[in-house]
Design a protein with these regions (language model features):
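Thiol-/selenol-based redox modules, centered on thioredoxin-like
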Residues: 386-416
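A short beta-strand-turn-helix
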Residues: 284-303, 329
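TPR/TPR-like (Sel1-like) alpha-helical repeat modules
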Residues: 120-130, 204-222, 250-255
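Conserved redox-active cysteine motifs that mediate thiol-disulfide chemistry
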Residues: 307-324
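Short, internal strand/loop/helix patches
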Residues: 284, 350-387
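Conserved helix-turn-beta segment immediately C-terminal to the redox Cys motif
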Residues: 319-340
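N-proximal helix/coil linker or "cap" segments that precede and/or mark the start of modular domains
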Residues: 223-282, 296-299
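N-terminal leader/linker segments that initiate helical-solenoid repeat arrays
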Residues: 18-64
Length: 416
């Protein structure tokens, strides 16, 4: 979330019209300070911190602290996240992002009190996430992304708990939590956490295996790989006396990572068949009637995609011109026209088409395709040649030239 002048004004509006507005002098001072903060979230946080220090009993204290914490998260200001994040959580624990950031910062220091606080926040973080499990959106693309991020977040919450209980001397519980985290979302963090506590408990080979998992994890930062490699070798040598066979351990970890990735992708594609697809002509899109069209089935044909929406005025102007071009190629079996609707609310589409007497036969929903093709404005018309490459892209249109231009582009693509 970006903090800018408009956001500052929203905060000021809250202060002005809230149930407990601050005194005029306080509000004037805050208004002036926020105006000077400009577009910088760092300055925004500094202003709010100074204001709260001067006015610790401000009627809008909770709202100001919440805004301060969000701005601090934006710029990764650990001091302010910790100092004000715990104050914010004391008023409202239902803040997953704040719970995670505060717990993570607390665990940067191996201290009993900090670990106990971090454990409390990490457990609440997990609880908040699991409460959200049933709120996945209906849209397949959004649902797949939600499930992926939800699993990743739950895994993070368990890794944080593992670190906290480990710091508190509960090694076996830490190992169990780290293993559970890795099962939910295999990645470098839970693998490294499990390896650390396994090594501490004297289970060198198991530790080496998890260090290998961290080493080969696709999401592992480059700067951590060398450390994982060293720890893996150290744990292995303690058990085996040398590094002979260590390469096999790494290969096994690689094969596990590949297998895990394949299974996860298959699971997500049950929800959204386009998960992980990077070639637009390999996409599967939904028809207005609920059917599915695999664009790969159109291989060898020229594909014309018209991206539009019910709320788009220029799209209505372009539509009869687009239909005129379609008629020119009505007898061309190697040209396919697809209307790609981009409305967020798909229930608006059919009534719109019926009331405007537009055809429904070749209308499909974008299902994430517009994002892949970076369609940022509509109408946009994209022509793919018979090899599946983008041959022409028309962002917007010039009414008096559109028919001739699109006709020429399609004819040229047919001849390729």
């Amino acid at each position: 979330m970006k903090y800018s002048v408009p956001v500052a004004f929203l905060l000021l509006a809250l202060l002005s019209f809230g149930q407990n507005p601050p005194a005029d002098a306080e509000q004037k001072e805050l208004t002036a300070a926020l105006s000077e903060a400009g577009n910088s979230p760092l300055e925004f946080a500094r202003v709010l911190e100074q204001h709260l220090t001067k006015y610790p009993n401000s009627p809008q204290r909770d709202e100001l602290i919440s805004a301060l914490v969000k701005a601090s998260i934006e710029v990764a200001d650990k001091r302010r996240i910790l100092a004000w994040g715990e104050k914010s959580l004391a008023q409202n624990m239902d803040q997953p992002q704040v719970l995670e950031r505060v717990a993570r910062i607390l665990l940067e220091v191996d201290d009993k009190d900090r670990s106990e606080r971090a454990l409390k926040y990490a457990r609440k973080y997990e609880e908040s996430l699991r409460a959200l499990a049933g709120s996945a959106p209906d849209n397949p693309t959004q649902k797949a992304k939600f499930l992926e991020e939800h699993d990743r977040a739950v895994g993070r919450s368990l890794s944080l708990q593992a670190r906290a209980v480990g710091n508190l001397g509960k090694t076996e519980e830490a190992i169990a939590l780290a293993r559970k985290s890795f099962e939910i979302y295999p990645g470098h963090e839970p693998a490294r956490e499990a390896a650390k506590w396994l090594a501490k408990s004297g289970k060198g080979i198991e530790a080496a295996r998890f260090f290998a998992d961290a080493f080969v994890a696709p999401d592992s930062p480059a700067e951590m790989r060398a450390k994982d490699r060293a720890m893996m070798a150290e744990s292995y040598r303690k058990e085996k006396g040398s590094e002979a066979g260590l390469g096999d351990l790494v290969l096994e970890a690689h094969d596990r990572a590949v297998g895990i990735g394949v299974k996860r992708l298959a699971r997500l594609r049950e929800v959204d068949p386009n998960t992980g697809v990077t070639n637009p002509t390999e996409y599967t899109i939904s028809s207005l009637e609920g059917g599915k069209l695999k664009l790969a089935s159109l291989k060898g044909k020229v594909i014309v995609m018209d991206f539009w929406a019910t709320w788009c005025g220029p799209c209505r102007v372009q539509h009869p011109l687009y239909e005129e071009v379609k008629k020119k190629f009505a007898d061309s079996e190697d040209v396919v026209f697809l209307g790609i609707n981009t409305d967020e609310d798909s229930t608006l589409v059919k009534p719109f088409l019926e009331s405007n007497q537009w055809g429904t036969k070749t209308v499909y929903f974008e299902d994430g395709l517009s994002n892949l093709l970076r369609v940022s404005s509509i109408p946009t018309t994209i022509v793919f040649d018979k090899q599946g490459q983008v041959f022409s892209r028309m962002n917007g249109f010039i009414p008096e030239r559109f028919v001739d231009q699109l006709t020429a582009r399609i004819a040229e693509a047919k001849g390729q």
